[in-house]
Amino acid sequence: MANIARDIFKAYDIRGIVGKTLTDDAAYLIGRAIAAKAAEKGMTRIALGRDGRLSGPELMEHIQRGFTDSGIGVLNVGMVATPMLYFAAINECGGSGVMITGSHNPPDYNGFKMMLGGDTLAGEAIQELLAIVEKDGFVAADKQGNVTEKDISGEYHNHIVGHIKLKRPMKIAIDAGNGVGGAFAGKLYKGLGNEVTELFCDVDGTFPNHHPDPSKPKNLQDLIAALKNGDAEIGLAFDGDADRLGVVTKDGNIIYPDRQLMLFAQDVLNRNPGAKVIFDVKSTRLLAPWIKEHGGEAIMEKTGHSFIKSAMKKTGALVAGEMSGHIFFKERWFGFDDGLYAGARLLEILSASDNPSEVLNNLPQSISTPELNIALPEGSNGHQVIDELAAKAEFEGATEIITIDGLRVEFPDGFGLMRASNTTPILVLRFEADTQAAIERIQNQFKAVIESNPNLIWPL
């Protein structure tokens, strides 16, 4: 039996610490396992790309050898943003591709996001890869798969510039956090006719300025300062592999992705009345009424880019988004999460206004907390912890308890959420209400539930 760290096989992807849990041998074996699944589905070619992390080239070499030793051909697109890899996979490889990325994890992490035949691998499909590795269930190849190298950045760029039309040129600031999006974002937005101020757009896998995670307010402070001190009208920020978008207004307000989705949904519904819109369990309770008000069907899903993509395929939804910043357009695009493209769609909408910040600031808003995290004791299972807490929890005044992903408790004047993260050993909490008093009341109810487990420390 092959020796591989089981805990790198996560819910949405494979992710580990390079050289410790994610080794060169592991990359090779994972390549063999993905190739076995591809062969089973009759696929002969896989697109392969990497982000700007320092460990990317070496991992790429070993996973690629896993493919070719199994007789699977490789379209190697080099260093790209994750959505560019998806673009190559869909247009050149029948929807099969692997992206080597650590997303927003610390610099010593890396991993693989995978799709086969247009389906993103998640949950059980990822556990099947582990089973193949552990049982040596690899395919024997008659001959080596061949490798073709291709720069797809031009095609990707032209595809977007070809159909996104701004009403006027805008002045924008972008912050790539030294992630791979910095290699492409400036050129893309200039190609749409904008004047672009670039922050931290040189790709550097050590992330020397701030962490490339736009879901955390501290990582947007440089962009906020640039907007206040310069003449840019709007700020866009990206995570390490540019499949997530952060948005900041001229006056320094962070427009979280659930509010971004209000604007995107309204735009899509203008052209497609009755369309389905998907959002994740962490989203504002103001979103579903907004979607219905604008003639759409609102669907809540569990958090996770692979789950959302799967739900989009199942329901035929035209647009979706989740609180972490993944925005998915099926209308006029391919249905995968793409921070660069979402930025372009946002500029297309905002260019119709002389005051884009006003448009964003006028979107409905409640009082809410950012995402709050509770560290779990070493070796504990977050989903099990949630189940144990939920079993004895009581919520006075609750109107609905939603259990599709953790516990979301709705009240007449707000909601509280606790769920297990699928990527890190933490519980995630979020609260929203009409008033500060209501948010504190809801938090206190959750605090009592959390503190029933002596190993958990309330984060506020």
UniProtKB/Swiss-Prot annotation:
What does the Swiss-Prot or TrEMBL cofactor note state? Binds 1 Mg(2+) ion per subunit.
Q: What is its main location?
A: cytoplasm
Specify whether Lipid biosynthesis is a keyword of the entry.
no
Which superkingdom heads the taxonomic lineage of this protein's source? Bacteria
What Gene Ontology cellular component terms go with this record?
A: cytoplasm
| Residues bound to substrate | S103, H104, K113, D243, R244, T303, E322, M323, S324
- What are the entry keywords? Carbohydrate metabolism, Cytoplasm, Glucose metabolism, Isomerase, Magnesium, Metal-binding, Phosphoprotein
CDD domains named among the record's database cross-references? PMM_PGM
Similarity comment: family membership: Belongs to the phosphohexose mutase family.
Q: What is this protein called?
A: Phosphoglucomutase
Species: Neisseria meningitidis serogroup A / serotype 4A (strain DSM 15465 / Z2491)
